[in-house]
Amino acid sequence: MRLLARLIALPVRGYRLLFSPWVGFNCRYQPTCSAYALDALERHGPFKGTYLMLRRIGRCHPFGGSGYDPVPGADPKHDRCCGRTP
């Protein structure tokens, strides 16, 4: 992971360590939003990874979707099925 991506990942890791145990593991998606954020930063770098992370967090609300939603490129079979490009 690039240095900038590691810096962006610090608040996500802090959330997972400090807040997630208190508020519960109640993400609407699989993988969880924090796992998605770390995977997006690792796979796509700091800029596209941050974009994907913010887009996912924006969709995670009671009126948003739910279910299996991996990072583009993480599951090629799912990408082909749904017409997503990495």
Swiss-Prot record:
Lineage per the UniProt record: Bacteria, Pseudomonadati, Pseudomonadota, Alphaproteobacteria, Rhodobacterales
InterPro entries for the chain: Membr_insert_effic_factor_YidD
Protein name: Putative membrane protein insertion efficiency factor
Topological type in the membrane: Peripheral membrane protein
Subcellular localization, as worded in the UniProt entry: Cell inner membrane
Coiled coil: none
Keywords: Cell inner membrane, Cell membrane, Membrane
Listed Pfam families: YidD
A GO-annotated cellular component: plasma membrane
Annotated S-S bridges: none
Organism from which the protein derives: Ruegeria sp. (strain TM1040)
Family designation: Belongs to the UPF0161 family.
Keyword Hydrolase carried by entry: no
Job of this protein: Could be involved in insertion of integral membrane proteins into the membrane.
Keyword match Membrane: yes
Superkingdom of the source species: Bacteria
